[in-house]
């Protein structure tokens, strides 16, 4: 499979995941999540699984092997520098019970291919310490944006665990054309229930990457680039009730994101987008099971290639995959982070069109040269943090 096809498949999985998350757990709220974080964790689980479980995960990810996901990741990680205005880091962590040991082949894969840190812990006697350790790891690898991924309510689950796998994604990008904070003013944002809230809107007088399509507009806001080029895309329905039809359209058109990219800067009339900052967390394993990925979560989940044990890992299964993401968009740029933890057990414009994002919209953060989507979400109410 060519790299381009792998990325296209990855983005198709993104859309499927987004539709299911919105339909089942978003409950009419703001949403942000990192599909790449969930996919990396699934890839890591596949690498430690027997053939049946591995094949089901790879089929879900629409990839022939875990190597293809590593190639996708390389497209967005490579190219950064310490002094860059753009920061992207993806980290993996593994915690294994002190009475078990990782199979050498799996440990080698974790450390060399996934660059994962591995620690031995006492799940049964010191579950609170394990929770603190995982949460500290998440905080460090998201630059403090996510301070807790495991709650105290998970003590019983942790106490009976053998293995905890975690992935963290952190992104911070500065706009290539920043907004002047002195021009930020409060305006009405119209909610789905017909009411409105006053929120700060950013604006500037620069030309914008903007294009109109049937029923919606797309705005591209580039970040300062290094060897990579990241952008935020805002997909704004023309109608206040147009979000659901737009999501349906995105899900029904192959390569939607590649086919709806504003390529030219144009003069814009009224131009306003809201500042927003929020987090979202959900049990990703429940969504994945609803989508047909069941094998890793069943008793005898086939995680036979992970640990050395008398049962050869036959009794291991993934009890849950927890995902938490947060995002902040302001005049300077975007800061976003996500952590996934798996516990084993074109229409032409009239002149100077407007772009006023004063109603619910979808967004992505994507690397433009490869097309990889890093974050995706919806903004229903920017006043909710």
From Swiss-Prot:
What residue ranges are annotated as transmembrane? none
**Pfam families (UniProt xref):** Serpin
Positions marked as site (Reactive bond) = 347-348
Q: Which UniProt keywords apply?
A: Protease inhibitor, Serine protease inhibitor
Q: Which InterPro entries match?
A: Serpin_CS, Serpin_dom, Serpin_fam, Serpin_sf, Serpin_sf_1, Serpin_sf_2
Q: Which GO terms describe its cellular component?
A: extracellular space
Where do the segments described as RCL lie?
A: 333-357
Q: Which CDD domains match?
A: serpinP_plants
A single GO molecular function term of this UniProt record: serine-type endopeptidase inhibitor activity
Keyword Transmembrane helix annotated: no
PANTHER family, alphabetized: SERINE PROTEASE INHIBITOR, SERPIN, SERPIN-Z10-RELATED
UniProt function note? Probable serine protease inhibitor.
Q: What is known of its domains?
A: The reactive center loop (RCL) extends out from the body of the protein and directs binding to the target protease. The protease cleaves the serpin at the reactive site within the RCL, establishing a covalent linkage between the carboxyl group of the serpin reactive site and the serine hydroxyl of the protease. The resulting inactive serpin-protease complex is highly stable.
Which family is it part of? Belongs to the serpin family.
What's the protein here called?
Serpin-Z10
């Amino acid at each position: 499979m060519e790299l381009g096809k792998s990325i296209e498949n990855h983005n198709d999985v993104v859309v499927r995941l987004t539709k299911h998350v919105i339909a089942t757990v978003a409950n009419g709220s703001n949403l942000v999540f990192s599909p790449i974080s969930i996919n990396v964790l699934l890839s890591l689980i596949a690498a430690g699984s027997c053939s049946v479980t591995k094949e089901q995960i790879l089929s879900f990810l629409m990839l022939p092997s875990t190597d293809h996901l590593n190639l996708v990741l390389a497209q967005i990680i490579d190219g950064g520098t310490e002094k860059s205005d753009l920061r992207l880091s993806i980290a993996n962590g593994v915690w294994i019970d002190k009475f078990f040991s990782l199979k050498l082949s799996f440990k080698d894969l974790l450390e060399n291919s996934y660059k994962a840190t591995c620690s031995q812990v006492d799940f049964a006697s010191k579950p609170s310490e394990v929770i603190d350790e995982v949460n500290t790891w998440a905080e460090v690898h998201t630059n403090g944006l996510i301070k807790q991924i495991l709650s105290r309510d998970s003590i019983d689950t942790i106490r009976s665990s053998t293995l905890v796998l975690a992935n963290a994604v952190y992104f911070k990008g500065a706009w290539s054309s920043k907004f002047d904070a002195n021009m930020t003013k409060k305006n009405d944002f119209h909610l789905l229930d017909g009411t409105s809230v006053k929120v700060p809107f950013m604006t500037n007088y620069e030309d914008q990457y903007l294009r109109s399509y049937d029923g919606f507009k797309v705005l591209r806001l580039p970040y300062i680039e290094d060897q990579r080029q990241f952008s935020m895309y805002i997909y704004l329905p023309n109608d206040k009730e147009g979000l659901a039809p737009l999501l349906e359209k995105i899900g029904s058109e192959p390569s939607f994101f590649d086919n709806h990219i504003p390529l030219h800067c144009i003069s814009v009339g009224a131009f306003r987008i809201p500042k927003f900052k929020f987090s979202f967390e959900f049990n990703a394993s429940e969504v994945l099971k609803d989508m047909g990925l069941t094998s890793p979560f069943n008793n005898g989940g086939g995680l036979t290639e992970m640990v050395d044990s008398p049962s050869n890992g036959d009794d291991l299964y993934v009890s849950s995959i927890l995902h938490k993401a947060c995002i902040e968009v302001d005049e300077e740029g975007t800061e976003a982070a996500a952590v996934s933890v798996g516990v084993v057990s074109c229409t032409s414009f009239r002149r100077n069109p407007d772009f006023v994002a004063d109603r619910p919209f979808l967004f992505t953060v994507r690397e433009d040269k490869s097309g990889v989507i890093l974050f995706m979400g919806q903004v229903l109410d920017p006043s909710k943090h």
